[in-house]
Amino acid sequence: MNKQIEERFTTYLQTAGYTEKTIKSKTRQAVLFNQWCKKRGTSPEAIDYKSCLKYIEYLKGKGNSKKTINHKLTHLRNYFTYLVIESYRLDNPIENTIIRGEKTQSYYTLLTRDELEDLYYSFETDKVLHDNAYNKMAAKRDKIVVGLLVYQGLDTKDFRGLRLEHLKLNQGKLYVPSRRRSNARTLELKPWQMMEFMEYVNTVRPVLFRKVKNPVDYQQLFPYGEQFTLISVLIKKLKKYNHKVTSAKQIRASVIIHWLAQHNLRTVQYMAGHKHICSTEKYVQDDLESLHDMVDNFHPIS
């Protein structure tokens, strides 16, 4: 590996905010990849996707697990991105390449798409315990929150940061602000969500706000006081509709995995608010073709 490129790559990683330990790991993988390329008469600047698959096959032959290979590919993606930024390459050949079949350690029983939608459509807003105006308003709010869990895959902490100004009903969208561990994103609302939000803003929210003691912020989309218990209370209700429901994290994980069946990794990364693509890759759990089958069937190598 060219010493000058190695130094610039290190500087690039430092600027990106990686720790010293991570930088060493990424640089080491870049050096090893350069050595492999040199032995085969190519270079990281010139290698194509098909040859990158040969490198993956090489790593597999060295006894690396699928999880380890994916970690190494994550480092190489950073390296290729750097080469593109520095105009050494025009593309990142492994931008969306992952080894499927690696099982993420999941403690959730994932919900199907139908089960997710049933949580929303089955949620009662008319028949509520202690039938009074406030409880009916609270039930309507709760159904909106269920919709944001099921359709937009929001994290529990996302709800705390939502303000009235983030709801863009004229555009049919919701802006979710960034947090320390997540990126901001703008997500589309379903038509029926927009209708419910219109009623919520004009009628429901004002009633609920009057019941909140010491509200954190008068512009909160979902008003709360000293503690935010809305989601934990709501999950208990959802368990009555489907005993498989365990947590908001389980619902979010299910939503993200269904997104991955429809969209590419980068799109799902944005929708989920993940800061790093590797966070999105962890949700890939499909038992698809083995690496060997993928290479032979789709990219024949002599």
Language-model regions, residue ranges each:
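Conserved catalytic core of the tyrosine transesterase superfamily
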Residues: 1-302
